[in-house]
């Protein structure tokens, strides 16, 4: 079915007439999106990536999380309107706005409030799945990053940019990885393999950051892209938010975000300790994710400038080096 045909069917489910216009929009890494104009209303049509090698149910995961947010009265995310599981299309509320250019303390407080809001009534979310790549032990966090490091070593020197990436991986990233892995593996087995109690987990948008926020005309923020959302270790959620390569937070705003969010969760002392241990690990993981640009693109992936992605990987590696320097051996 074409996007227009799917849209017509989904609009009929919510009692709307056929669309006047279905306009493709710049998409994300794992989906395609269209603006749908219907009379005086606008909607968002979203197509979710799926393949035999990556069969994650992105539509189901996002839909369940958006329904949960609506059930607790949150209006910070788009309303889910209609879906077609057979074609992996969904019709969502269209949020008009642009990614925020300037960030201030009020934006940090807004994001912290959104995280608090979704975690205030966990009983409503007991049936939600875990996030994609959820990790509930130190060992699981380590193994997830190890898998990405191993994959990076498949990159070949097929161009000048690829050669620079290979050199960076060999001379910087692998040395950093080996040092950090040695530190973590020096922990007692019981500490590395201890499973985080369900009561200490959090609900997370997963890909949470200002790169997935839209500033509306009144200055307020709303958030999009919940296709990996679910239960997670709050340490991972907080680290990812402050270290998104697209929008790395300056130190003062990152500190404010942690100040406002750490008390939201049970056992903040243990959370502080996990943050200190896992922050450089996830900065290394983000460097690996940036370097995915050096692999052949998946069908939905936009082409990322290789020099930009290598620069971002270098930034993440530098941040990891700084974090490791803060922590005594």
Segments from the language model and where they lie:
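An alpha-helical support segment within catalytic cores of ATP-dependent transferases
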Residues: 2-18, 123-206, 271, 328
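Residue-level signal for well-ordered alpha-helical scaffold segments within enzymatic catalytic domains
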Residues: 9, 64-71, 93, 117, ...
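ATP-binding pocket architecture of kinase catalytic cores
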Residues: 23-26, 30-157
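Active-site acidic catalytic loop and adjacent metal/ATP-binding pocket
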Residues: 23-40, 44-45, 184-237
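Activation segment
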Residues: 97, 221, 229-231, 244-247
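ATP/Mg2+ or Mg2+-diphosphate-binding catalytic cores
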Residues: 164, 288-329
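Short amphipathic alpha-helical segments and their helix-coil junctions
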Residues: 182-189, 220, 255-274
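Active-site activation/catalytic loop segments of kinase-like enzymes and analogous catalytic loops
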Residues: 234-268, 280-300
């Amino acid at each position: 079915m074409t996007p227009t045909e799917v849209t017509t069917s989904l609009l009929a489910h919510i009692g709307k007439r056929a669309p006047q216009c279905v306009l493709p929009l710049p998409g994300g890494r794992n989906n395609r999106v269209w603006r749908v104009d219907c009379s005086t209303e606008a909607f968002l049509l979203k197509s979710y990536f799926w393949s035999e090698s990556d069969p994650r149910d992105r539509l189901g995961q996002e839909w369940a999380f958006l329904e949960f947010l609506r059930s607790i009265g949150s209006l910070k995310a788009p309303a889910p309107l209609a879906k077609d599981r057979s074609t992996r299309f969904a019709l969502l509320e269209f949020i008009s706005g642009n990614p925020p250019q300037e960030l201030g303390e009020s934006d940090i407080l807004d994001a912290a409030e959104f995280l608090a809001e979704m975690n205030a009534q966990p009983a409503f979310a007991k049936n939600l799945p875990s996030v994609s790549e959820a990790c509930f032990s130190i060992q699981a966090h380590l193994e997830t990053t190890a898998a990405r490091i191993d994959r990076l070593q498949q990159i070949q020197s097929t161009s000048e940019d690829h050669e620079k990436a290979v050199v960076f991986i060999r001379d910087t990233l692998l040395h950093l990885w080996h040092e950090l892995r040695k530190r973590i593996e020096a922990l007692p087995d019981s500490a590395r393999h201890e499973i985080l109690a369900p009561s200490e987990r959090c609900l997370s948008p997963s890909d949470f950051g200002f790169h997935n926020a839209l500033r509306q005309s009144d200055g307020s923020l709303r958030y999009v892209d919940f296709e990996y959302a679910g239960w997670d270790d709050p340490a991972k959620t907080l680290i990812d938010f402050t270290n998104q390569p697209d929008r790395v937070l300056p130190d003062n705003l990152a500190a404010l975000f942690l100040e406002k969010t750490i008390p939201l969760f049970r056992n903040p002392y243990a959370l502080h300790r996990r943050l200190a241990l896992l922050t450089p690990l996830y900065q290394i993981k983000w460097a690996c994710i940036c370097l995915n640009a050096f692999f052949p693109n998946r069908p939905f992936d936009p082409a990322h400038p290789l020099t930009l992605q290598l620069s971002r990987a270098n930034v993440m590696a530098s941040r990891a080096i700084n974090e490791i320097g803060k922590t005594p051996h």
